[in-house]
């Protein structure tokens, strides 16, 4: 965000008088922020230093994530750039087949059977 330009600003409106909401249909599940790999550990340290309850470092195979909730309960994610989706398939054919991270491979049949076609 520091470089400016399109999609480079985040504006936060603080309105403490609003009621806390309950998650439901049509609501926001989570908001993800991308960070360079070199900054990932600093974000983890900063959350911990500030006393923000968080998931700790989570390996998502294609990237690493940190999760924490803002005061109204929306889940925020800070995700690293790498290693990236091309770690296990050629970039030219990304998205042409169903690729699962190794820790989910044993559940492939169940996952694939629950997928709904996109019209």
Role assignments for model-derived ranges:
Residues 60-64:
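Short acidic/glycine-enriched loop/turn segments that link adjacent beta-strands
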Residues 55-59:
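Conserved S-adenosyl-L-methionine
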Residues 1-54, 69-119:
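Glyoxalase I/VOC metalloenzyme domain signal
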């Amino acid at each position: 965000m520091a470089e400016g330009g399109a999609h480079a600003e985040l504006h936060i409106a603080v309105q403490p008088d609003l009621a806390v909401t309950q998650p439901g249909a049509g609501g926001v599940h989570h908001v993800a922020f991308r960070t360079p790999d070199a900054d990932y550990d600093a974000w983890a340290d900063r959350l911990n230093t500030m006393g923000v309850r968080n998931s700790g470092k989570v390996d998502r195979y294609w990237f690493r994530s940190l999760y924490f909730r803002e005061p109204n309960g929306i889940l925020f994610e800070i995700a690293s750039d790498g290693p990236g989706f091309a770690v296990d398939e050629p970039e030219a054919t990304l998205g042409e087949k169903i690729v699962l991270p190794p820790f989910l491979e044993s559940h492939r049949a169940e996952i694939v059977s629950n997928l709904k076609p996109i019209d």
